[in-house]
Structures are given as structure tokens and as C-alpha cells.
Regions:
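Carbohydrate-binding surface patches
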Residues: 605-647, 690-693
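Aromatic- and carboxylate-enriched substrate-binding clefts and catalytic-loop regions
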Residues: 367-553
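An acidic-aromatic substrate-binding cleft motif
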Residues: 258-351, 359, 363
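Bacterial N-terminal signal peptides
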Residues: 6-15
């Protein structure tokens, strides 16, 4: 009798569990998400072709007041649906993007409080997105999130490419290791930055790239980050379970919310082909469509600028070294002794304008044009810039008129020194000044600790600020390239005037001691998953004035214009360095910044990437390959070309004796006729690459 009772009890428990379990599969059936209530606790699991990717993982929230949203739930409703549509981005890697998914919405009620929580899952052929939705039902109105408790229980001790979890910077080099090794390697992975706040010996940032022992590629990230803090991941390295770790505010709280509210999407990309990670549109598809009726003023940009002069030690942002401190409206620069190192001066900027006009560039970025740079960094100074007053040697009116006469624009620069309240105070006046003089793009910066003091770069307050700056810029038809801001999560679909972000370790670090060769072969798998990066490639002179060395070859730099997608591309080096190598510089002049079609031909994280892209509105193709710490040999098929048509290919390759450390400027250029049946044998040296332009023959 006792055995019969036990059997009946187990059958009852099984029935309860099966009644609360529901699942949804991808359109092609390879990915499956299962939702369940495990003893009233919401959980989900993900499989790929029957293999576990995410083991049963808990979902929910700890709240500051009113009781948590972690357990005590019943399933009170379920909806399923699907969508298959095609949309056209304002700019992008492809002319059109397919948005094809199956969807499941589960409606939960916490019986003890009668509070409702919905969870929506969208399953694509290459990944999963899910988010929390808080309906306006009367029992939960205003609430404060103490912690989000979303778990990602991994099915093994995977290889991962990671950077330390941090509330203030992503400007780290990537470490490749097993998940179980993160703890022991964390200390060495943390390098100094002007603003950084790490939080755990096993905390890492998204986008997190992983590879399983049997060849699955898994990427964890988020999409549509709005009115919510950015998510890091904290690893339980015994169980191999990641838990979401939100960026706190100055009080330690994570998010102040009110219903109705939708969280950002949590994303799990899964594929058995690394190339599909790079080609995925999962993050973009999970964002809302474009909010603007008129986007005619948003255009991709290829630009040059004085920036590398300051970064590499040739010049300064500041006009004078006379003043140890500056008071806006009181410091008299007309009485200051110029240092002679100020790069943003009339003669120098005219030189860059002339260079841009002669070589077909759209804009010239001028940093250091405005007063206040003498004490701008590291002082937690609130009133640091006014974004309106130029230095005495920068004639803003005359220089813009000169640029426009040559069909070139100047690009504005708004470094905030992270004094956010100050920037918001001047923002409209700064944008109005841009309209007055014909600027249509601004590079903003957030160097240093955030003011209001105690806030972090990736907290809810700052996430809202970055988006407000983009939306307000749109009122003035201005495009934004935000540096040191929160890492992108696909919002460029919704707000396409956000044409660039830094939000990672860019080329500037090549002048601060250098980055490892594999860095540019991992960024497209990680940082670029959320949106394009203003990486600022194109350095030809690898030995910087400050003694640092750029760990790349010239051909490796050329390849970045194809492998590192962005509608905003800079030729970052000095004009005179390009004029020394005019044949190699020709590729930078020719390469497009907007595309009809993009293909990833070869890829392995941190090892190599080969991409081919068709320039928008033309039949011209461009190919780029970057290599990591080891050489990479390609047997490159040109089968993507139109059949029956002949093309002229200009092939830029590392010379056999090229070496990123000792002989980085050794390259070869070959021209040959190619067709869709052509196969090319090409080699990129370690830290190098190759680039090809392919144009139809007339």
C-alpha cells in the first residue's frame, strides 16, 4: 500500500509539472525553448537539435519592497504565434533583413499577492530572445528592482572569450579560457582605466562568446536596452550557471520601474557555424522599428580628423599649458600663451579639409576645438565645457565655410568628461550651434567617473541619458557617435541617427601600449553583436610618437574596413602617412560604408574573419580578412560574384616577410581578372590580413 501511495504521489507531481510546461521551437525546428514552473518557480531551458544549450534556469526578480517575484507562481495563460516579415534598414550590412520567428507568451500570477508577470519568448533559427513584461493590473504599480535573477545554466565548461564585468568600462582585452578558469585569470584581465568598477572575481560582460566541446557557438547578450541598467553576468563556476547582474545606481538599487513595463530582451544565440554568429540579425530584429518618419538626413560617413595627433602624442587637445584650472566665462584665453601643440588650429584643420576634399572623404573630425581642455580629465569637475565657445585659434565660422566650399563638413566633438548634468544643461544650445554652422554629426565622449557622483556609465540613469541625447539630436537632424557610452543593444534600428559607438577597446589603445593581434578577430563576435563600432582603423605608421607600437600590418588595417562593419569609418592616420603609401591608401578611398549584401566566408573567434560585402547601389564587392595570433591561409572562392561576368580584382596582401612587430609595412598589390569560378590562395600573416576590391570589367 505504501508503494502504491508513493507511485500515485509521483504521478500527481508529474502531472502538475507537465501541466505548467510549454514549449516553442524555431521555424526550422532546430532550436527549442521549454518553459516550466518548477515548484512554482519559473524556469526555461534551450536545446539545439536535441542537445542541451541552457539547462533549466530560473527566472524572476528580487524587489526592494513588497515581496519578491521569484516563486509562488501559477500559469494562468499562454499565447503562441509567429511572424515572417522583411524590413529595410536605413543603413546596414544588407539592403533587407528577414525577421522570422515563433513566439510564446506565458502569463503568470503570484497567488499570494495576485501580481502578474508575463514572459515572452521569441525563437529564431539562430537564437532565442526573451523578456519580462509587467502588465498594468493594479497590484504592481511602482516598484524598485533589487536584483534581476535571470539564470543561464550552461551545459558544460565551455571555452569563452570574455572581458571583466564592470559598471563603467568595456575597454579591456579579451581573454580566452574555460569558464572554470575565469576566477584564476580575472586579476590579470583587469587593466587600468580612468573609470572602472569591477564587481566579482567571476563577473563578465556581454556580449559573451562561447564554444562547446562539440562545436556549438553560444552568445549571450541583450537587446533593446531602454530605461533599465545594463546587464553583466556573474558565474557560479562550480555549477557553470550565469546569473544576470545589473549595474546599480548610487544607492545600490538597480532599476526604478512602473507598470506597464517591458524589460530588455535577454538573448541566447546558438549555431554550429561561427559564420552565422557574425551574420545574425537576432539583436536588430528584437528591437522596435525606426521611430522616424523622415530619415533622408541620416547618411553613412567616411571621415578623417586630427584625433590621432593627440592620441599618439603629436599634439594636444588643450590650447595652453598656462592655466592649471579653468573657470568657464572667466578664464581669458586671449591673454594665454599658446603651447604650440594645439592640434585644432585653423591652419592644421584647413590641411585636413584639403586632404578630405582631394581624396573623397565626407567629414573632418576636430577634437579640442572648444575651451576647457586644460583641466578636463580626472578632476570630477562639473562645469568643464560649454560646447559653444571655440579656442582663439579655431575660427568656427570661417572653417565651416571653407569646408562647405569644398563639399566637406566638419564633425562636431562633445567630450562631456562624464559631467552629464552639465551636458544636459547645454545640450540644446550645443545642437543649435551645430545647425547654425552646418554640422550634421557629433562624436560625444564620456571619459572619467560619472557626475552625478556615484552613478555608473551603465546604470539606468545613464542609459536614459544616452538615448535622450540621441533622440534630442534627431530633433536637430544630427547623427550621434557616442564613445564610452553603454554597449549597443540594437537600438540603431529604432534610432538610426545613432550611427556609431565605441564601447570597447578601440584603435586608441594601440597608442597606449598596443592590443593583441586577435583583438580585431573577436570584436565582431562580441561587441559588434549589438551594433557598429567606431573602431577608427587605417593606421599606416605603426610606431607612434609616444613610443607605442600598433600591432598590425598595413593590410591588416585595410581589412578592418570590411570585417569591422560600421556606417561610420575613419581613416585615422596623418595625411602624410597615407601619401607615403598612395597605392595602399587607394583601398580606403574606394571601400564603401553602406552595403546591399554581406557574406561571412570564414570565421573563428579571435583567430580569423573573412568577409565579403557588396557596396550599396553598385556591383562592386570588397573582401577583407584579419588574422589573430597565427597566420591564416584562405582558399577563397569568389562564387558570390555574378555568373558569366568578368571583374577586375585589386588584391592587397601581406608580403611573405611581413611581420606586425618588425616589418608591418610590407605588402603586395596584384591586379587580375576574376569570375565567379575563381579561387584565390591568400595568406594573412599573424596580426595581418588582406583586402580585395572587385569591380565589374567594362
Amino acid at each position: 500500500m505504501r508503494k502504491i501511495f508513493l507511485l500515485m504521489f509521483l504521478l500527481l507531481i508529474s502531472a502538475v509539472h507537465s501541466a505548467s510546461a510549454t514549449e516553442v521551437a524555431s521555424p526550422n525546428g532546430t532550436l527549442k525553448v521549454t518553459f516550466n514552473l518548477d515548484n512554482t518557480v519559473p524556469t526555461y531551458a534551450v536545446t539545439f537539435r536535441g542537445k542541451p544549450v541552457i539547462k533549466p534556469s530560473r527566472l524572476g526578480f528580487a524587489l526592494v519592497k513588497g515581496g519578491d517575484l521569484l516563486d509562488g507562481f501559477t500559469l494562468v495563460g499562454e499565447e503562441k504565434g509567429s511572424a515572417d516579415e522583411t524590413w529595410t534598414p536605413v543603413w546596414g550590412e544588407n539592403r533587407t533583413i528577414r525577421n522570422h520567428y515563433n513566439e510564446m507568451l506565458v502569463r503568470l500570477e503570484q497567488k499570494s499577492t495576485q501580481r502578474m508577470l508575463n514572459i515572452r519568448f521569441r525563437v529564431y533559427d539562430d537564437g532565442v530572445g526573451f523578456r519580462y513584461e509587467f502588465p498594468q493590473e493594479g497590484k504592481l504599480n511602482y516598484f524598485v528592482v533589487k536584483d534581476e535573477r535571470t539564470e543561464f545554466a550552461m551545459a558544460g565548461d565551455h571555452t569563452a572569450w570574455w572581458i571583466p564585468g564592470d559598471y563603467d568600462t568595456q575597454e579591456y582585452e579579451y581573454t580566452q579560457s574555460r569558464l572554470s578558469q575565469v576566477r584564476q585569470l580575472m586579476k590579470g584581465a583587469i587593466t587600468d582605466n580612468m573609470s572602472q568598477t569591477t564587481f566579482s572575481p567571476t563577473g563578465v560582460q556581454t556580449s559573451l562568446m562561447m564554444k562547446t566541446a562539440d562545436g556549438l557557438y553560444i552568445n549571450l547578450h541583450e537587446a533593446a536596452l531602454v530605461d533599465y541598467p545594463a546587464m553583466n553576468l556573474n558565474l557560479d563556476d562550480r555549477e557553470m550557471v550565469f546569473t544576470s547582474w545589473l549595474t546599480p545606481d548610487a544607492t545600490g538599487a538597480k532599476a526604478y520601474l512602473h507598470t506597464p513595463f517591458r524589460s530588455p530582451w535577454r538573448t541566447v544565440m546558438v549555431t554550429d557555424d561561427a559564420r552565422r554568429v557574425l551574420a545574425s540579425n537576432l539583436i536588430l530584429n528584437l528591437n522596435d522599428p525606426c521611430k522616424y518618419a523622415d530619415t533622408s538626413w541620416i547618411r553613412p560617413v567616411k571621415y578623417v580628423g586630427v584625433w590621432w595627433e593627440m592620441i599618439s602624442g603629436k599634439g594636444d587637445w588643450a590650447y595652453t599649458q598656462q592655466y592649471p584650472s579653468v573657470i568657464l566665462g572667466e578664464t581669458d584665453y586671449t591673454k594665454a600663451k599658446p603651447s604650440g601643440r594645439h592640434s585644432a588650429n585653423n591652419a592644421n584643420v584647413r590641411k585636413y579639409i584639403d586632404f578630405a576634399a582631394e581624396h573623397g572623404f565626407d567629414q573632418v573630425l576636430v577634437e579640442g576645438w572648444n575651451i576647457g581642455w586644460e583641466d578636463w580629465a580626472g578632476n570630477m569637475k562639473e562645469k568643464v565645457f560649454d560646447f559653444q565657445t571655440p579656442y582663439p585659434d579655431f575660427d568656427i565660422k570661417a572653417l565651416n565655410e571653407y569646408a562647405h566650399s569644398k563639399n566637406v563638413r566638419l564633425m562636431m566633438h562633445h567630450e562631456t568628461s562624464s559631467s552629464v548634468m552639465n551636458y544636459e544643461r547645454y545640450m540644446d544650445r550645443a545642437y543649435q550651434l551645430m545647425n547654425l554652422y552646418g554640422y550634421n554629426a557629433v562624436k560625444s565622449g564620456y571619459v572619467g567617473d560619472i557626475i552625478p557622483r556615484g552613478e555608473h556609465h551603465y546604470g539606468q540613469v545613464m542609459v536614459n541619458h544616452y538615448l535622450e541625447a540621441v533622440k534630442r539630436a534627431a530633433d536637430y537632424k544630427i547623427m550621434v557617435n557616442a564613445h564610452e557610452a553603454v554597449r549597443p543593444t540594437g537600438l540603431c534600428r529604432t534610432y538610426p541617427n545613432l550611427i556609431g559607438n565605441e564601447s570597447a577597446r578601440g584603435t586608441e589603445y594601440q597608442a597606449f601600449g598596443g592590443s593583441k593581434p586577435g583583438h580585431t578577430a573577436i570584436l565582431p563576435f562580441t561587441r559588434l553583436q549589438g551594433g557598429p563600432m567606431d573602431y577608427t582603423p587605417g593606421i599606416f605608421e605603426m610606431d607612434c610618437a609616444n613610443g607605442s607600437h600598433v600591432n598590425s600590418t598595413i593590410c591588416g588595417q585595410l581589412a578592418l574596413y570590411v570585417t569591422m562593419y560600421s556606417p561610420l569609418q575613419m581613416a585615422a592616420d596623418f595625411p602624410e602617412n597615407y601619401l607615403r603609401y598612395p597605392d595602399a591608401f587607394q583601398f580606403i578611398k574606394d571601400v564603401a560604408v553602406d552595403w546591399d549584401r554581406s557574406l561571412y566566408l570564414e570565421a573563428e573567434p579571435m583567430a580569423y574573419i573573412t568577409a565579403a560585402r557588396k557596396a550599396k547601389g553598385t556591383d562592386n564587392w570588397f573582401v577583407g580578412c584579419v588574422s589573430g595570433n597565427a597566420p591564416h591561409k584562405s582558399q577563397l572562392s569568389l562564387s558570390f560574384l555574378d555568373k558569366g561576368r568578368k571583374y577586375e580584382a585589386t588584391i592587397y596582401t601581406d608580403a611573405p616577410d611581413a611581420d606586425y612587430r618588425s616589418n608591418p609595412k610590407a605588402y603586395r598589390i596584384e591586379r587580375r581578372t576574376v569570375t565567379s569560378s575563381t579561387k584565390l590562395s591568400l595568406t594573412a600573416v599573424a596580426g595581418g590580413g588582406y583586402a580585395i576590391s572587385i569591380v565589374p570589367k567594362r
